[in-house]
């Protein structure tokens, strides 16, 4: 049994790739769509319980909610750029629908989406 575990550990040890040295060109970036009422936002605070404080590009500070389907896949930290979808009923709240990676944020800055 010990031999089996050591071979698996040895076989999988080289499968990790370093992310820090990986520089690749961004070809397609999802942009906020006005017809879906989407807006770019920056995460100010993590409030806990799937809630964050967002500073939206339209000048409104909203409480954002991370839907349960995206909670495990989308790890959000302070300072991240996200797409928020404001609620129709309450304008002070929004759903977080997309999180940008670092190369995508650089692309958005170059193209003028972020002020």
From Swiss-Prot:
Keyword Protein biosynthesis: yes
SMART domains: eIF1a
Start and end residues of each S1-like domain: 27-101
Keyword set, alphabetical order: Initiation factor, Protein biosynthesis
Matching SUPFAM superfamilies: Nucleic acid-binding proteins
InterPro entries, A to Z: NA-bd_OB-fold, RNA-binding_domain_S1_IF1, TIF_eIF-1A, TIF_eIF-1A_CS
Region (Disordered): 1-34
Family statement: Belongs to the eIF-1A family.
Name this protein carries in UniProt: Translation initiation factor 1A 2
Organism: Methanosarcina barkeri (strain Fusaro / DSM 804)
């Amino acid at each position: 049994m010990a031999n089996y575990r050591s071979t698996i550990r040895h076989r999988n040890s080289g499968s990790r790739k370093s992310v820090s040295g990986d520089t690749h060109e961004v070809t397609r970036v999802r942009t906020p769509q006005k017809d879906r009422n989407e807006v770019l936002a920056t995460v100010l605070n993590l409030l806990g319980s799937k809630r964050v404080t967002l500073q939206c590009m339209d000048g409104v500070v909203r409480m954002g909610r991370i839907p349960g389907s995206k909670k495990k896949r989308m790890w959000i930290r302070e300072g991240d750029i996200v797409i928020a979808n404001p609620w129709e009923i309450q304008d002070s709240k929004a759903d977080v629908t997309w999180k940008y990676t670092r190369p995508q944020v650089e692309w958005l800055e170059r193209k003028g989406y972020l002020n």
